[in-house]
Amino acid sequence: MVYGKKRNFILKTTKTIIEMKKILITGGTGLLGKELVKGFLDKKCTVYFTSTSKQNSDKFLKSIKLKYKKYCVPIIQNFNNYDDINQFITKYKKVKFDTLINNARDISNLNLKVTNYEHYNSFNNEIFLAVYLPYFLSINLNHKFLNHIVNITSMYGVVPPNKNLYTDKYKSSPIYYGVSKAAEIHLSKELAVRLADKKIRVNSISFGGIEGRVNKKFKKLYAKMCPLGRMLKPKEVFEPVWFLCSNQSSGATGHNLIIDGGWTTW
């Protein structure tokens, strides 16, 4: 299900109509995804974003400024297997995306599973969303127009969790989360090399903990263990992503930008 219109603007000097940049964000209705959608809208882009829930998508759209709504293109889409990816690519391959932001994930995988079978499935699901999905989207979207790819990863793709932060024996940060994010960081480097001749820059961002889904006790403990003494705020998420999609980072590809308040420095 898709809503939206093509967005254009007119250069006053030449009166030439130029199509605005189109951005594709997977996972656009989560804590981080919503900040990215709003940020790109503020930069006057047309934003396509995926969500697995029409209810969440509709709720999010109600919170967006009225003047931006027509520049939003919500796509209700599950990514559970290769067929889902292939159907999505077939449908949107001709869209002239300038930027791809790979941010999709399944929050339910955060909970450590009880049985080996459940654990096995969660491991596969996490790897699928962090590696397979970004890879197949990156190599199959229209490279004639694609200029930037940014993979959203985590500080736990750089360092393992600190056991002193968790009172539930890592249940809130299962091993497959960090492993999949580490793989996504390396995928970014591989794609940066392989897509360089097409003038497509590929980078990743490892964010630290972001306020919004944790209790006060966790925030206080996290603050004691982080050099900046706090978690990231949702409003701090967009600008680093924008930096990697702008001419200010024109010489950067294959880089993993760490925004974690200094967590990984010790």
What positions do the PLM features span?
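Short, small/polar-rich loop/turn modules that mediate ligand/substrate recognition or access, typified
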Residues: 196, 201, 252-254
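Conserved mid-core segment of classical short-chain dehydrogenase/reductases
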Residues: 105-122, 160-169, 214-217
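Catalytic loop of short-chain dehydrogenase/reductase
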Residues: 150-197
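Short C-terminal tail/terminal secondary-structure segment
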Residues: 253-266
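Catalytic Tyr-X3-Lys loop
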Residues: 106, 113-135, 150, 173, ...
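A conserved structural motif in NAD(P)-dependent oxidoreductases
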Residues: 226-237, 248
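Conserved glycine-rich cofactor-binding loop
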Residues: 29-30
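Conserved glycine-rich Rossmann-like NAD(P)H-binding loop of the short-chain dehydrogenase/reductase
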Residues: 43-59
